[in-house]
Amino acid sequence: MSRIGKRPIPLPKNVTLTLDGQQVTVKGPKGQLSRVFPPEVNVVQEGEAIVVKRRDDSRPAKERHGLCRTLLANMVEGVSQGFTKKLEIQGVGYRAQLQGKTLVLSMGYSHPVEIVPPEGITLEIEDNQGKKVQQGTIVLVSGIDKELVGNTSARIRAVRPPEPYKGKGIRYMGEFVRRKVGKTGKK
């Protein structure tokens, strides 16, 4: 039995779960998420908890058991609290700017890079003191779908990933970038 899969998911008071065959819908104060789970697993509500059970001990069922439990736990956490990722921009002249909902990045290219967030994702810019501003070096990506927040953050980071010599680029807040010594340092 999967160690992760057999743990029950606590259901907060302000979150409701709707089961329709393999379709699971979770509603909460932040919004609503829905997902179709594979036929190898069953989602059951037992009182104030959700339990993911597998139908049999086949290999595909064992493989998906823990995954489905984690996906469902992320859905519950997303509609109740939401997810946020912080990205930090480092480099002289590198900055982010919000124009409506579109994020415009000035990253040293000959043109500004525009990123339009998908539905359900909000982008904000902070300064170093944590105040919301229109132009700055810290980008907040937030939403209720953990996968969408992560993918949007990765798309923003991919515009200019941190380089190992000077550390310039876009990195996740707290990400460690291994530095290298340049050619002059080897001799």
From Swiss-Prot:
Protein name: Large ribosomal subunit protein uL6
Function: This protein binds to the 23S rRNA, and is important in its secondary structure. It is located near the subunit interface in the base of the L7/L12 stalk, and near the tRNA binding site of the peptidyltransferase center.
UniProt entry keywords in alphabetical sequence: Ribonucleoprotein, Ribosomal protein, RNA-binding, rRNA-binding
Keyword rRNA-binding: yes
Source taxon at top rank: Bacteria
Endpoints of the signal sequence: none
Assembly behavior: Part of the 50S ribosomal subunit.
Cellular component terms (Gene Ontology): cytosolic large ribosomal subunit
Family designation: Belongs to the universal ribosomal protein uL6 family.
GO molecular function, one term: structural constituent of ribosome
Pfam family, one: Ribosomal_L6
PANTHER family: 60S/50S RIBOSOMAL PROTEIN L6/L9, LARGE RIBOSOMAL SUBUNIT PROTEIN UL6M
GO BP: cytoplasmic translation
Entry keyword Ribosomal protein: yes
